[in-house]
């Protein structure tokens, strides 16, 4: 999953920065935010094992939102109301807000997103287009577990039957 995005970035760029941030503005249900896996120490070990030169940026909520945890409203030409957006109003405003903020802080030439979250990939592309940020958004193929399930940090919440 995410390690494959890093591998691609390492192959195509002189410097790779990985952001790790659980964004509160993406969660409609506060319980989902509390249950979301947070494994920063493990993640940093995996990243260092992949390549010790990767820069890890793991800001706090305060670093990002400076005391005001609010998402910026975006017009994604209606894409935010389709598919997942039908069931999670405001979710993609949260996505747009955090990705825009991270792009402003890091100033990447290239940003890599998995095609597993295809609607999110389209949303990020639309946000970059509308805000005229100078970032090349690159979609990367889905990586799967040996049983065919798409790799995801949320998989740890599933049991064998699911």
Give the role of each language-model region:
Residues 1-162:
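Nucleotidyltransferase catalytic core that binds NTPs
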């Amino acid at each position: 999953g995410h390690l494959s995005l890093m591998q691609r970035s390492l192959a195509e760029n002189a410097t790779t920065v990985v952001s790790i941030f659980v964004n509160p503005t993406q969660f409609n249900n506060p319980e989902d935010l509390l249950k979301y896996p947070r494994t920063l120490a493990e993640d940093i070990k995996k990243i260092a094992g992949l390549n010790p030169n990767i820069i890890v940026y793991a800001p706090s909520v305060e670093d990002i939102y400076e005391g005001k945890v609010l998402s910026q409203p975006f017009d994604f030409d209606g894409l935010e109301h389709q598919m997942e957006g039908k069931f999670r109003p405001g979710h993609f405003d949260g996505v747009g807000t955090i990705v825009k903020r991270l792009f402003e802080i890091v100033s990447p030439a290239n940003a890599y997103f998995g095609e597993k979250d295809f609607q999110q990939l389209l949303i990020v592309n639309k946000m970059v287009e509308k805000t005229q940020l100078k970032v090349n958004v690159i979609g990367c193929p889905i990586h799967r577990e040996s049983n065919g399930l798409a790799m995801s940090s949320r998989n740890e919440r599933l049991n064998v039957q699911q």
